[in-house]
Amino acid sequence: PYLSNMLNFDPDMPAFFLYYEKGELVGLLTVYADDPDVEVAILVHPNHRRQGIARALYRSFETETASYPIESVTFQTERVFLERHPEFASNWGLVEDEETETWLGKDRRPYPLATVSNLDVLLADRSYQDQISQLKFQAFSEEHESREVVDRYVAKALKDPESRLYILLKNGQVIGTCTVDLSSNTNYLYGLAIAEHERGKGYGSYLAKSLVNQLIEQNDKEFQIAVEDSNVGAKRLYEKIGFIKQTQVVYLKPKE
């Protein structure tokens, strides 16, 4: 789960619920809410499952967030968990959403990468904020109905000490962008986007490889990336450059 409320639409809304037993943390519920359609992830220690901890955490979430304008709740889980617990969804009155995503990982081996004279991969600053927002909004407009959500992502990534927002410049113009979250034990890449008119020319691959090479020099972490399974082109790109599937993330919604 994403252990930050930095991107939530209301930073005052409770985002983390902890369940302790005899002083030991055995359950965690996290809330990811970049808009009022929120995503909830619940983790319970394997030795403490089937004891009502997940439901207790969820009841606490419902109570504590009742005064906030939440429009819907989606549960995030993994395909492997549902295969091991096939009764989970029906017990909770949930059905699978058709949208799934795959998390892929990569070791610290650098890429052989020739420099291209008119391309630069740089850490972004505020002067590029509007160009980055525009590019991300065009690339991910189906995910984010409002430009305001994209603007918030970009502004927070520029400010947050645990984030790095990179841009790919071609002849001085922003044609690509990618954010790296450093808050966990991996370099987590997300939001990689190439301007529509520049796709299919290898720039996505160049940006990803360049980022990996730069980050290898800056820290000792391995790499992780998440991609929607419907985004076949991006998934193929990451697999082609050596990212290996780790898990499939599934979203569950209450039955209508």
State where each predicted segment sits:
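Hydrophobic adenine-recognition pocket in adenosine-nucleotide-binding enzymes
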Residues: 44, 192-194, 227
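Active-site rim helix/loop that mediates acceptor-substrate recognition in acyltransferases
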Residues: 1-25, 143-179
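A structural microfeature
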Residues: 27, 97-100, 176, 204, ...
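Conserved acetyl-CoA-binding loop-helix of GNAT-fold acetyltransferases
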Residues: 50-63, 194, 200-217, 235-240
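Acyl-donor-binding surface of acyltransferase catalytic domains
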Residues: 35-36, 46-117, 252-254
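Conserved donor-binding loop and adjoining core beta-sheet/short helix segment
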Residues: 2-65, 76-80, 178-187
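A short beta-loop-alpha structural element at the N-terminal edge
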Residues: 119-134
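Glycine/small-residue-rich hydrophobic helix-like segments
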Residues: 150-214
